Amino acid sequence: MAHKLPARGRPAAEVLADLKTFSSADPDYRHGRLWSLAYYQDEDYAAFLGEAYSAFAGANGLNPTVFKSLKRFENEIIEATAALLHGTPEVCGVVTSGGTESCLLAVKTYRDRARQVPGVGRPDMIMPVAAHVAWFKASEYFDVKVR
């Protein structure tokens, strides 16, 4: 095995230099050289996002009674989205960490709802062959048939 945890920590500058080296072969997403997966506006906006991220990087949204700010963010995002979609006050939602988690939770919710409907049995999803792999992963995890 080539990689082991070092006996002692390394200076931050050394670690950051390694990170820069590691990313040197990555595609140039900052200048329109990547058609998806990364979305870049400009340096000022990237700096703003970095500062906003670092303000909450250590927070954990698992328990909203501890990090009340994260719960507030989630509630405001859900309320704003519901308003955009003309939702009623009874609308509920969840904020996810990204695309795959969103697909997983959507299929789990669909599967759970299907279990409450008499006569449904094993639910199914109709998907195009070009569907994102996350939908197939969700179908396996939650026993939903793909057609």
Please tell me what each predicted stretch does.
Residues 44-48, 61-147:
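PLP-dependent aspartate aminotransferase-fold enzymes
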Residues 1-90:
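N-terminal entrance/gating region of PLP-dependent enzymes' catalytic architecture
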